[in-house]
């Protein structure tokens, strides 16, 4: 791995400023490489010192380069000094990044002082070689029943997380961070790409409350945060995902850990690339997107993978513009996803959390030759039962349960129990639910649903299935309810 070292630097002059894009002239023969970081420094129009880091994107002739700024360019003046660092953007990596918040440049922005690390890595790196990849199809157990049973995640895979505001995306993300730390000894990296600053602040506060970030002992924290919010220049929003990915790669390759990488929101990564592409004068492609859309997306996604040392499993929130799944941005994202987790407002309104829609969520891993016949048959039976219940709901609403056949009444009763049994108390939500969190192993989940279908639990009240972990807790809760 290339650890950052100082190199001989050459200096140029700022000759043109076009919003967040700048042109810089260097001495002939000393033009920086594409993707090199260039630092512009000097006095701004108000006479104050300013420093702007840019990334070289184009070579204009034998002396000039066009670069994209990672900081606001207000106050820059022509003639300012621009120093080539000789390397791409370098960001800190390692255990000292846990519990901290960084910007795209790897600078801490949480007012907790500098990060004590000598190790820095460039954000532009090649994807792992084919010979280093781990091609085994292994399930990544999350301890969340509805995910593990119906739409299992692939170890080293990519998962799309779909859901509107207020349906529990943040809580689900925090539970996954908590579970990977406890069950897999892994760490997480969260990339806030082009989302609201308020949401980033809320997430940080909630992580501190739930113990995912340990403020008194940062080394015990389970996550590093990298933010490039929507008020920042497009260059920062375009590169913040790569900064977070570089930190995650270090944990995978050097610490040999399983890493969870969250990207919220992958659409904003594409959107920022579109803005930069237009500023660089490239001809737009379909719907005004950049002509390099597939290449840019592939460059990020291909680095998210399992190697023989460890894995990076990525969960990406996907915004679908105007609910149009054929839009080039979500359509390009879908090509890379192994699973989709869809959060339903209807389930959240019923108080069933996590509000994962069991019928809309999908996974390429749910195949009998990957998960085994028992798991596959159980998952299909759950989906069939819930689908039939959904079809019967109109009849129930108009005519009532009494008009159904005996067989359908039994199916509805089991479907309602299944719906509630797919809910689960979370560790990070203990303060809200008052119930201790539960991690449920996949084998235990399958055993529970098989008992439901075998009719062993038909006599139990459906409220016994709500917000519990394993099936044994259902039986204990039912006994407690009847004794009352």
Curated annotation (Swiss-Prot):
UniProt record, GO biological process:
proton motive force-driven mitochondrial ATP synthesis
Question: Which is an annotated Pfam family here?
Answer: ATP-synt_VA_C
| GO annotation, cellular component aspect | chloroplast thylakoid membrane; mitochondrion; proton-transporting ATP synthase complex
Query: InterPro entries, alphabetically?
Result: AAA+_ATPase, ATP-synt_VA_C, ATP_synth_F1_bsu, ATPase_a/bsu_AS, ATPase_alpha/beta_chains, ATPase_F1/V1/A1_a/bsu_N, ATPase_F1/V1/A1_a/bsu_N_sf, ATPase_F1/V1/A1_a/bsu_nucl-bd
The protein's enzyme class = translocase
Q: What is its EC number?
A: 7.1.2.2
Report the membrane topology from the UniProt record: Peripheral membrane protein
What Gene Ontology terms describe what this protein does at the molecular function level? ATP binding; ATP hydrolysis activity; proton-transporting ATP synthase activity, rotational mechanism
Q: Which reaction does it catalyse?
A: ATP + H2O + 4 H(+)(in) = ADP + phosphate + 5 H(+)(out)
Q: Where does ATP bind?
A: 163-170
Keyword field contains ATP-binding: yes
Q: Does the keyword Transcription regulation apply?
A: no
List localization entries: Plastid, Chloroplast thylakoid membrane
Keywords (alphabetical) are: ATP synthesis, ATP-binding, CF(1), Chloroplast, Hydrogen ion transport, Ion transport, Membrane, Nucleotide-binding, Plastid, Thylakoid, Translocase, Transport
Instruction: Name the family.
Output: Belongs to the ATPase alpha/beta chains family.
Q: Quote the subunit structure annotation.
A: F-type ATPases have 2 components, CF(1) - the catalytic core - and CF(0) - the membrane proton channel. CF(1) has five subunits: alpha(3), beta(3), gamma(1), delta(1), epsilon(1). CF(0) has four main subunits: a(1), b(1), b'(1) and c(9-12).
Q: What does this protein do?
A: Produces ATP from ADP in the presence of a proton gradient across the membrane. The catalytic sites are hosted primarily by the beta subunits.
Q: What is this protein called?
A: ATP synthase subunit beta, chloroplastic
Q: Which organism is it from?
A: Stigeoclonium helveticum
């Amino acid at each position: 791995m290339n650890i950052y070292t100082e190199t001989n630097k050459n200096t140029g002059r700022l000759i043109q400023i076009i919003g967040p894009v700048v042109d810089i002239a260097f001495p002939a023969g000393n033009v920086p490489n594409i993707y090199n970081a260039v630092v512009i420094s000097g006095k701004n129009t108000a006479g104050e010192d300013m420093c702007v880091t840019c990334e070289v994107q184009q070579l204009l002739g034998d002396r000039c380069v066009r670069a994209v700024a990672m900081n606001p360019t207000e106050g820059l003046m022509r003639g300012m000094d621009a120093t080539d660092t000789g390397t791409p953007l370098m960001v800190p990596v390692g255990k000292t990044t846990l519990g901290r918040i960084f910007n795209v440049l790897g600078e801490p922005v949480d007012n907790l002082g500098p990060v004590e690390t000598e190790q820095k890595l460039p954000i532009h790196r090649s994807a792992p070689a084919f010979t280093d990849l781990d091609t085994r199809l292994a399930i990544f157990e999350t301890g969340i029943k509805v995910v593990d049973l119906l739409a299992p995640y692939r170890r080293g895979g990519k998962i799309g997380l779909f859901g509107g505001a207020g349906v529990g995306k943040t809580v689900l993300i925090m539970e996954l961070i908590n579970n990977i730390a406890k069950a897999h000894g892994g760490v997480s990296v969260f990339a806030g790409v082009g989302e609201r600053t308020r949401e980033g602040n809320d997430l940080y506060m909630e992580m501190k409350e739930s113990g995912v970030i340990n403020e008194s002992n940062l080394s015990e924290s389970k996550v590093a945060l990298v933010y490039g919010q929507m008020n920042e220049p497009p260059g920062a929003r375009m590169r913040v995902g790569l900064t977070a990915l570089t930190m995650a790669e270090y944990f995978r390759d050097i610490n040999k850990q399983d890493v969870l990488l969250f990207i919220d929101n992958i659409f904003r990564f594409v959107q920022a690339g579109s803005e930069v592409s237009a500023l660089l004068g490239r001809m737009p492609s379909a719907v005004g997107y950049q002509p390099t859309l597939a290449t840019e997306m592939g460059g990020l996604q291909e680095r998210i993978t399992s190697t023989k040392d460890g894995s990076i499993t990525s969960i990406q929130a996907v915004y679908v513009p105007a609910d149009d799944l054929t839009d080039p941005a979500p359509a390009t994202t879908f090509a890379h996803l192994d699973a989709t987790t869809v959060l339903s407002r209807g389930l959240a309104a019923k108080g069933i959390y996590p509000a994962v829609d069991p019928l809309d969520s999908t996974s390429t891993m749910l195949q009998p030759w990957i998960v085994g016949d028992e798991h596959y048959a159980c998952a299909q039976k759950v989906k069939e039962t819930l689908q039939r219940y959904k079809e019967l709901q109109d009849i129930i609403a108009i005519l009532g349960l009494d008009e159904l056949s005996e067989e359908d009444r039994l199916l509805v009763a089991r479907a309602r129990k299944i719906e509630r049994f797919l809910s689960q108390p979370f560790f990070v939500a203990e303060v809200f639910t008052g119930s201790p969190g539960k991690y449920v192993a996949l084998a235990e989940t399958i055993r529970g649903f098989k008992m439901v279908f075998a009719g062993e639990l038909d006599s139990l009240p459906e409220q016994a299935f709500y917000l519990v972990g394993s099936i044994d807790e259902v039986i204990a809760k039912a006994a407690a309810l009847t004794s009352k």
